[in-house]
Every structure is written in C-alpha cells, then in structure tokens.
Amino acid sequence: MVQAKSWTLKKHFEGFPTDGNFELKTTELPPLNNGEVLLEALFLSVDPYMRVAAKKLKEGDRMMGEQVARVVESKNSAFPKGTIVAALLGWTSHSISDGNGLTKLPVEWPDKLPLSLALGTVGMPGLTAYFGLLDICGVKGGETVMVSAAAGAVGSVVGQIAKLKGCKVVGTAGSDEKVAYLKKLGFDVAFNYKTVKSLEEALRTASPDGYDCYFDNVGGEFSNAVILQMKTFGRIAICGAISQYNRTGPCPQGPAPEVVIYQQLRMEGFIVNRWQGEVRQKALTELMNWVSEGKVQCHEYVTEGFEKMPAAFMGMLKGENLGKTIVKA
C-alpha cells in the first residue's frame, strides 16, 4: 500500500500564515480501480493566489495547488506508467486519479527544459503573463509598460514579453538583488520601491510621459500611485494584490474615480482559466519556444523536500523568492 502525505489547512489564516495553520497528514491509498492511475509528485507549486483561495477551504481540507507528477501505476491506457502530467492535485505526495484534469506535457517538450517549468514560465504563471499583457492590456510596440512585483513568476515574464513586442518596460521589486535581476532580463528601468525616497517621483523619473499599460500584481497604495501616472486611454490588468492578502484591517481605498474617468482608463481583473482549448495550447507552445530559444529567461527558487511546503509558501509571500517558487518533492 502507498502512504500519501498531504498538507492540510489546520486553521484558517488570520493575517500572515504561520506553521500552526498547517498540518501534515498521512493516509493509506486504496488499490487502483480500472481506469485509474497512481501519481507521485515530482514538483509542487506555491503561488500567491493560494492565500486568498484558502478562504474557500474548510479546516482540515488539503491545501490546493498544481504539481507535476509521474504515473507510477496505471489501469488507464490513456496514461501509461511513466507518463508525466500537470494537474491541480494539491499539496500531496501521492494521489489517485481517473484521468480527469490531468494534462500531459507536450510531446515536443525539449529535453533541455526542466519539467518544473510546467508550473512556471510554461505553465499557469507564464500563461497569466501572456494573456494579461497581450489580451487584457492589448499592448502595442512603442508603448511603455509598468510591472509591479516584476521579479516574481508572473511579472518577470510580463516584462520579457513586453520587450519582445517592442515596448519600454519599467519594473519594481523589493530588493537590490531583484532589481539587478530585472536589468539582466532586459527591463529598461528597474528600482527598489522599498528604498526610494518617493514612489511617485521614482515612477515619474522612470517614465516622464507616463504609462500606457500597468500590469498590477500588488494592489493597494502602490497601485494607486501608478494609476495617477497612467496616460490617457491607459490599460490596467489587475492580476493580483499580494500587498493586501495578509491584511487584518479594512481594505485601502482605491484610485480616485475622477482619475479613471478623465484619463479614460480601462481596468480589468482576470483569471487565467478564462483562456482554454486551442488558444491556451497555442500560448503554451509559444512560451515553450521562447524559453527554448533563449528569448525568455526564467529563474526558479527551488526548495527541496515535501515537508517544507508551508515554509516555501510563507517565504514566497514574504518575497524571499527570485522568480518562480517550486518545491521539489
């Protein structure tokens, strides 16, 4: 019998998560029925959205999340033993599936690309960057793009795609190391928002004419400051609000309505699951090719050991990661 280890939500978060919010449980999995497969986690993802999505869980539920897994036993001809898949299986070491929700990695996946990239640049974060910038913002060559949390899994890809499309790109991050990383990726301007004397002045200096597009990963007062410097007909893709996820007080006031009205701005929130089927597959293929050709670089912040899932999650929320946070099981 296979023993599956799973991280569960012991207690709902109040403010920033702590070790006490999580509990590691072990369960014995039953034998496979016809049509089922046994999966072993290889790499697991931790992402900011999990902080908010956990509100929908009951205490005792398994933490949600995507993983790259290997089929170690199969009674389903569509997924023979050894098949590598990506799936929303949660924080668990082993699981049983009937095949629904399992996505095989593309057959053309280059050998030189780590499988873990299916959780990052060639997965949900990369798709979020791709569709948020190209569809929601509708970016055009020659425009100026502002990216917050630019050294993260999504922001770093946003900036690089914007450069591929011929844009000027400004990015912000929370450490000098991350700023150096952004410049290495090709960002035209990058600065540490924690050390500048005035965020408003730093934004103005980076782009005196303002911003055509803002890819918002942080929300809060930071984003209010950016919105004040948007050009007329500017577009804002609201992807995340990581600065607000652990708040215990009231939500801060949003941008002044008159700014949005008179600058004729368009603000749109989005979730990447909106794009499915052929358009999603086409985007994944393009991302995979960009990475394989060296046009898009990616950095993974890897934590070794399934038992360190909560630590990796909390570290990501603190901004300890450079690029995509991954746990290697």
UniProtKB/Swiss-Prot annotation:
Annotated positions of the Phosphothreonine modification: 18
InterPro entries on file: ADH-like_C, ADH_N_2, GroES-like_sf, MDR_fam, NAD(P)-bd_dom_sf, PKS_ER, PTGR1
Reactions that this protein is recorded to catalyse: 13,14-dihydro-15-oxo-prostaglandin E1 + NADP(+) = 15-oxoprostaglandin E1 + NADPH + H(+); 13,14-dihydro-15-oxo-prostaglandin E2 + NADP(+) = 15-oxoprostaglandin E2 + NADPH + H(+); 13,14-dihydro-15-oxo-prostaglandin F1alpha + NADP(+) = 15-oxoprostaglandin F1alpha + NADPH + H(+); 13,14-dihydro-15-oxo-PGF2alpha + NADP(+) = 15-oxoprostaglandin F2alpha + NADPH + H(+)
PANTHER family, sorted: PROSTAGLANDIN REDUCTASE (PTHR43205), PROSTAGLANDIN REDUCTASE 1 (PTHR43205:SF7)
Keywords per UniProt: Acetylation, Cytoplasm, Fatty acid metabolism, Hydroxylation, Lipid metabolism, NADP, Oxidoreductase, Phosphoprotein, Prostaglandin metabolism
KW Ligase (keyword) present: no
CDD domains noted in UniProt: leukotriene_B4_DH_like
Cellular localization per UniProt: Cytoplasm
Residues annotated as binding NADP(+): 152-155, 178, 193, 217, 239-245, 270-272, 321
Keyword Transferase applies: no
GO MF term set: 13-lipoxin reductase activity; 15-oxoprostaglandin 13-oxidase [NAD(P)+] activity; 2-alkenal reductase (NADPH) activity; leukotriene B4 12-hydroxy dehydrogenase activity
N6-acetyllysine modification, residue list: 178
Function (record text): NAD(P)H-dependent oxidoreductase involved in metabolic inactivation of pro- and anti-inflammatory eicosanoids: prostaglandins (PG), leukotrienes (LT) and lipoxins (LX). Catalyzes with high efficiency the reduction of the 13,14 double bond of 15-oxoPGs, including 15-oxo-PGE1, 15-oxo-PGE2, 15-oxo-PGF1-alpha and 15-oxo-PGF2-alpha. Catalyzes with lower efficiency the oxidation of the hydroxyl group at C12 of LTB4 and its derivatives, converting them into biologically less active 12-oxo-LTB4 metabolites.
Main location: cytoplasm
N6-(2-hydroxyisobutyryl)lysine carried by residues: 178
One Pfam family in the UniProt entry: ADH_zinc_N
Biological processes annotated in GO: leukotriene B4 metabolic process; lipoxin A4 metabolic process; prostaglandin metabolic process
GO CC term (a single one): cytoplasm
SMART domains cross-referenced by the UniProt entry: PKS_ER
Protein name stated in the entry: Prostaglandin reductase 1
The protein's Enzyme Commission number: 1.3.1.48, 1.3.1.74
